[in-house]
């Protein structure tokens, strides 16, 4: 089987493995790429990524869709048995192009961001319905996202499937280290770090613990509290070390009707860390009612009222 993979990120082509680069971001010569290592032996996977930054990419970022990459995929589609797009920014445009031709391979699209960020926009939605009128197969990593299709894109529902997001347990492994009296949170996009910092600041007796915030430096002036430390984004290997040294990890997620933040809390779990995560569309499928797991039915803002 020949597969063409079109992800909405750039993939590093390497002659030898670099362990500090996560599996989705690298293709090592002579080794199967990412989750395709679980496919039958002999499966050929070619990748067309989004390419290097340039002036045209700035236009693509502005319109929030990739154009060059899907066009390249469209031009070579006949060479493949299956085309897999990861992200609607790539998949929507590719599907639109192939809707005008009769001969095309099967198209499987991972819809991470709810097509258009799950926006109920009556200008955008008819265009999306038209682009997807041939209804490709779709995989989502948040089961609640299926309700978006049922309500606004009913023709997609029969071909949409929820499959839980996987984690690289070979890279993220538990390790015994000396823990510090610190609580860690990380990530800039789609994080309610403001509420977390406000809640932590309201705790009278912090028992000697500090909150370490990675990647949200814009809040530094708002929370000059010496018990909150702000760090710049760091290499993954350094973040893993910091995670292992922390007493526990908090992933404060706002609510969106699509997948986000899953790598952060699943990787933390794979490291064997105690974890607090907001129950949202993105996380609810990964929270089990099991010993050691407790669900607190509060909106994130309640943290500031009940620190």
Which residues does each PLM region occupy?
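Short beta-strand->alpha-helix junction loop in the catalytic core
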Residues: 115, 162-172, 217-219
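Membrane-proximal helix-turn-helix segments that form the acceptor-binding/catalytic region
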Residues: 71-79, 118-138
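Acidic donor-binding loop of glycosyltransferase active sites
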Residues: 243-258, 273-274
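Nucleotide-sugar-dependent
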Residues: 237, 251-267, 279-285
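Acidic anion/phosphate-binding donor-loop and adjacent secondary structure
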Residues: 147-151, 164-180
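Conserved catalytic-core segment of nucleotide-activated headgroup transferases in glycan assembly
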Residues: 22-23, 178-225, 229-237
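A short, active-site helix/loop in glycosyltransferases that binds the activated sugar's phosphate group
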Residues: 135-158
